[in-house]
Amino acid sequence: KHSLPDLPYDYGALEPHINAQIMQLHHSKHHAAYVNNLNVTEEKYQEALAKGDVTAQIALQPALKFNGGGHINHSIFWTNLSPNGGGEPKGELLEAIKRDFGSFEKFKEKLTAASVGVQGSGWGWLGFNKERGQLQIAACPNQDPLQGTTGLIPLLGIDVWEHAYYLQYKNVRPDYLKAIWNVINWENVTERYMACKK
């Protein structure tokens, strides 16, 4: 069974950029619901497999994608953030960003634009294209997981569902995007980058 991962910091640790109320609801209610619903869906899926009921298996796939994606995405998101975050990455990741986007500022602009531009709910991502050996920016709707739907390996995810920012930033998604750069955990993003290069 899947379980809700602990946050590596307190709910209030990302203040003033993301307030404690948002973090508490987002982690203990929203992410917890994805985990619970994923477990229920997987149980039903196992039953359908055991019975050889292909129709039931197909019917369960949207719930598997939505709740499984929600669990995968949020598990990455919490580690991508840190009260000691912000600034720029260092070393090989910074070099790769400059190579693939021209500069760190241009990369920030592109990922911000992709995230702000998501229609409705979804995610903005920095991913790694293993075949090309390149960093790429992508946007995914709803809880579609990056790797499962695009093949890109997720390095940095920005949640642009309204539950991620509305209580603090209301309908002004660009203000939330400006703020989140102050808490990006570049050490975590770099670890992910180095791991997928092996």
Curated annotation (Swiss-Prot):
GO terms for molecular function: manganese ion binding; superoxide dismutase activity. One of its GO terms (cellular component) is mitochondrial matrix. It is found in: Mitochondrion matrix. Disulfide bonds: none annotated. Binds 1 Mn(2+) ion per subunit. Pfam families: Sod_Fe_C, Sod_Fe_N. The modification N6-succinyllysine is found at residues 44, 51, 98, 106. It comes from the Eukaryota. Mn(2+) binds at residues 26, 74, 159, 163. Its EC number is 1.15.1.1. The keyword Metal-binding applies. The modification N6-acetyllysine is found at residues 44, 51, 90, 98, 106, 178. Its cofactor is Mn(2+). GO terms for biological process: cellular response to oxidative stress; regulation of transcription by RNA polymerase II. Nitrated under oxidative stress. Nitration coupled with oxidation inhibits the catalytic activity. Acetylation at Lys-98 decreases enzymatic activity. Deacetylated by SIRT3 upon exposure to ionizing radiations or after long fasting. The keyword Mitochondrion applies. Its main location: mitochondrion. Homotetramer. PANTHER family: SUPEROXIDE DISMUTASE 2, SUPEROXIDE DISMUTASE [MN], MITOCHONDRIAL. Destroys superoxide anion radicals which are normally produced within the cells and which are toxic to biological systems. This is Superoxide dismutase [Mn], mitochondrial.
